[in-house]
Design a protein with these regions (language model features):
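N-terminal export signals
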Residues: 5-24
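C-terminal segment of N-terminal export signals and the immediately downstream linker at the start
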Residues: 20-36
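Surface-exposed beta-strand/loop patches in extracellular or lumenal glycoproteins
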Residues: 43-56, 459-470
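Extended acidic/polar, glycine-enriched regions
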Residues: 75-131
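Exposed aromatic-hydrophobic patches
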Residues: 86-89, 496-502
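Active-site mouth of glycoside hydrolases
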Residues: 122-336
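Catalytic-core region of carbohydrate-active enzymes that cleave or remodel glycosidic bonds
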Residues: 321-395
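Aromatic- and carboxylate-lined catalytic core of secreted/periplasmic carbohydrate-active enzymes
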Residues: 357-358, 371-488, 503-532
């Protein structure tokens, strides 16, 4: 059984009422901006009526120049069907803006307008970017630590499945990976991004690659807004090898046509990331130069420079290339993080570290304990990780033939709250992220002279002498990652400090600086930890 066969969607489970989306219509999913105002990093949309004859997707060009003072941002528009054209803009600074359209269609050309951008509302920190070399933050400087999950079919699954998935993610994960192009769901006929001219064969010859199905993208946009409202970033996978309609082997000009249309529609959503592909090296019809080209197209077409990466199966992409903002890896060899940072000089997210679940294949039956452990190993090595889950569905009962979580279904495993526990620990401990301490006897990370986090993995020492700086006092907290408990130790510690430990595996301890030592340092000076 292959992963693409296991991760199929079955019947939906109960709808989470609070997240039940509205019935899809042909109207824009974007809240009206006709009042003339939009928040910083919000989405301002211009809707115009224009030609509907011929093929507006290819025949009509449309863009707008958004100007504030001496600065102008060029943004491309798109055709949304039924004679409607849209231009979407994400303003990154407050104050007055004006715009003027440019189009090959006379009725769309030279349209002008003004609006005001006001301060962002609570919870809106702007798009995520890289920061502090190996970490991330929002545009307003708010720290962002990616603790993500995987819901491949979220953008094109049923509303019921999407509601279950959103309910499971909310409050637990702050990023999800989802495919823009569909994969087979095993539920009969699916809505598709391109019209068809009959039944497509493996090469996609029956697809009408000259136009798009706007309803497909409108549903996707609705899901993006739902994620945004829940504080979840959307890592949008642009290509993948799992389709049944020939999209993985489209002609080169169609690839570019699809990318430009998708970016014109989605780039103004502040929570968008671009994943050029999932398991790019399994898309046999594309070459490495094709993938480089796709990166350049995305980089050129996206006026906001959202994060960009690419995910692999066996052949790791060269993430040192300038158009790649961070590394997205399918691996769990976290011990190589240091050499990868040295080679790429960029943040690393281990986006696929296998799956918690119970399926036959080795990649899909991790215990919750092992999934939790792998997140700790990623963090302690100065990197990040993403969760995935795939359980066998029941043949009968209330959840018969339900979707797996990683194809946007119900969250069933036990690792998610433990991952959230780690996320909270990191967020309370640092504003910039944890950096690995090279040469530490036991795995450790933190900020020199401020924060020290040790993780003992499968070791279970009864005590250990920690080499803390002797120029400051530190408070210590014992952490049980799976039980999700913290025990603050009495007193403070400085210099070489021997501490009794729980004598059980997979434990951690965190030291936080509470004060500088005034005058002569006390305690033994720290010395390098001696290897065996």
């Amino acid at each position: 059984m292959h992963r693409r066969d296991v991760l199929k969607l079955g019947a939906a489970a109960t709808v989470a009422a609070a997240l039940n989306p509205k019935v899809l219509t042909g109207e824009s999913v974007i809240p009206s901006t006709e009042a003339g105002d939009v928040e910083q990093w919000g989405l301002y949309e211009i809707a115009l009526k224009g030609p509907s004859t011929g093929n507006p997707f290819r025949d009509v060009t449309l863009s707008a120049q958004f100007t504030q003072a001496h600065r102008t941002v060029e943004v491309k528009g798109f055709y949304d069907g039924d004679g409607t054209y849209r231009i979407r803009f994400m303003p990154d600074s407050t104050g007055p803006w004006s715009y003027k359209t440019t189009s090959s269609a006379a009725e769309l050309n030279g349209r002008t307008g003004r609006f005001t951008c006001f301060q962002p509302k609570p919870g809106n920190h702007g798009p995520v970017t890289t920061a502090h070399q190996f970490h991330f933050e929002h545009a307003d400087g708010t720290p962002y630590f990616p603790f993500g999950t995987t819901t491949y079919a979220l953008f094109f699954t049923s509303d019921e499945n999407a509601a279950n998935s959103l309910a499971g993610m909310t409050g637990k994960f702050n990023k999800t990976r989802a495919c823009v192009l569909p994969k087979p769901l095993g539920q009969g006929e699916q809505m598709l991004p391109f019209p068809t001219l009959g039944t497509p064969d493996a090469t996609g010859k029956a697809n009408d690659y000259t136009r798009f199905n706007p309803e497909y993208f409108q549903r996707l946009e609705k899901r993006l807004l739902q994620l945004q409202a829940a504080g979840i970033e959307a890592d949008c996978i642009l290509f993948h090898p799992y389709d049944a309609w020939g999209y993985k082997a489209m002609p080169n000009d169609v690839d570019d046509f699809y990318l430009r249309y998708t970016i014109a529609r989605l780039a103004a959503f502040r929570n968008v990331w671009w994943s050029i592909a999932n398991e790019y090296d399994l898309v046999r019809a594309k070459t490495m130069s094709d993938w480089d080209h796709f990166f350049r197209v995305v980089q050129t077409e996206d006026p906001y420079s959202h994060l960009r990466s690419i995910h692999h199966s066996r052949i790791i992409y060269d993430h040192s290339k300038a158009w790649c903002t961070h590394a997205s890896l399918q691996s769990y060899d976290f011990e190589k993080s240091a050499e990868r940072r040295l080679a790429w000089n960029k943040p690393i997210i281990y986006d696929e570290i296998q799956y918690e679940g119970d399926v036959e294949r080795r990649w899909g039956n991790l215990s919750a304990e092992e999934m939790t452990r792998r997140f700790w190993l990623a963090i302690i090595d100065g990197s990040y990780a993403s969760h995935g889950e795939v359980f066998i569905s029941a043949d009968s009962g209330p959840h018969a033939h339900e979707s797996s979580w990683s194809d946007a279904g119900r969250l069933r495993g036990d690792s998610a709250p433990r991952i959230k526990f780690l996320h909270d620990l990191v967020a309370r401990s640092t504003n910039v992220g944890l950096n690995e301490f090279d040469g530490s006897y036991y795995l450790s990370a933190g900020t020199p002279n401020q924060l020290y986090l040790w993780y003992f993995d499968y070791h279970r020492p009864a005590r250990y002498e920690f080499p803390l700086p002797n120029t400051a006092n530190f408070e210590a907290t014992l952490v049980d990652p799976f039980e999700m408990t913290e025990k603050k130790l009495p007193a403070t510690f400085s210099g070489k400090s021997r501490i009794d430990l729980p004598n059980k595996p997979y434990q951690a301890i965190v030291f936080r600086k509470v004060s500088d030592l005034v005058g002569k340092p006390t305690g033994k000076a720290p010395t390098p930890e001696i290897p065996d």
